[in-house]
C-alpha cells in the first residue's frame, strides 16, 4: 500500500474498491456499438456499426449544481446521477441526437466507496433510461480542495444524428404550434434560490412535510430526478414532425425558448394551459418571488418545448400519447413585436 500517498489523504485502495463496486452498474448500460469494457485509457465506440449515412456527432456537458447539497442534507445519493445524465442527454436530444455514450466525473474530498457506488448507480440508471452506454469516467480524490464529505459531479454525453435530420429551429415559421412536455419537478436548476427560499427564509428542512406537497418530505420532492426525454422525443424525430426543441433549464422559459427561434419571431405562451406543479407555488411563496420572475428561473412544470407545424400537431400529439407521454399545447409562434422573442400571456 502506498503509505506516502495515504498520508497525504489519498486512498489508492478505496479507489480500487470503487472500481470494483461500479463494474456491474456500468455493465448494465451496454448497448450496440460499444467496444470493450472499462479499464482502458479511453472508451471505444464503433459508430459505423449503427448504419448512419451522414452521421453528425453532437456533444454536451453539464452538472447538477447545488442540488448536490440537498442530496447531502437528505443523505440520499442514489438518484443524483440520473440528474447528471438527464441534464446532458436532454441538451443533445434537443438537437435531434440519439445518445450513444456517456462519461462521468466525480471529484471528492475523501473516497467513500459505498457513497460513490450510489452515485454511479444513479448515473447508470440514467444511462439505461437514455439508451446511452457508460463507457468511462474519473473519480478524483482531492483532499484540501473539498471537505471529506463533499463531492461534485459532472457528465459528458455524445450522441449522433443524420446530418439531414438535425433539429435546429431554422424552419420555424409564424403559426407553428408550441407543445410542452411536463417536468417531474424542479429538475436540476435554480437550487441556490431553492435552498435560500426554503431552508433559510422559510426555515424548512429536508424532513419537513407540507400538505401542499401531499405530505411528502421536502427533500424527497426536491430530489425527484430530472426527467429524461430521449424516448419521448425519438418517435417524433423519426417521423420528422419536430422543427425545434427547447430544453427548459437554467433561465426558465424566458431564456431557453428563444434559443430555438429564428430572429424576427417570438413564442407566445398561454399561461394556464398546463398544470404548474405544487413545488413551484411553495417556492414562490417561501421566497416571496415575483410570479413572472419564476418563469425566468424555473421550468414551472414544463421540461421541453417543441415547435410543430400546425398541420402535424395531431400527429405529434398521437405519437406522444402512444408512448404514454403527456403533452400540452402551450401557444404558438408569432411575429416578434417586443424584441424579447417570448411573450407570456
Swiss-Prot record:
Q: Which GO terms describe its cellular component?
A: cytosol
Gene Ontology terms, MF aspect: ATP binding; phosphoribosylamine-glycine ligase activity; phosphoribosylformylglycinamidine cyclo-ligase activity
What is one process in the GO biological process aspect for this record? adenine biosynthetic process
Give the first-level EC class, as a single word. ligase
Give the residue spans that cross the bilayer.
none
Q: What is its EC number?
A: 6.3.3.1
Q: Pathway involvement? A: Purine metabolism; IMP biosynthesis via de novo pathway; 5-amino-1-(5-phospho-D-ribosyl)imidazole from N(2)-formyl-N(1)-(5-phospho-D-ribosyl)glycinamide: step 2/2
Q: Which subcellular locations apply to this protein?
A: Cytoplasm
Which family is it part of?
Belongs to the AIR synthase family.
**Record protein name field:** Phosphoribosylformylglycinamidine cyclo-ligase
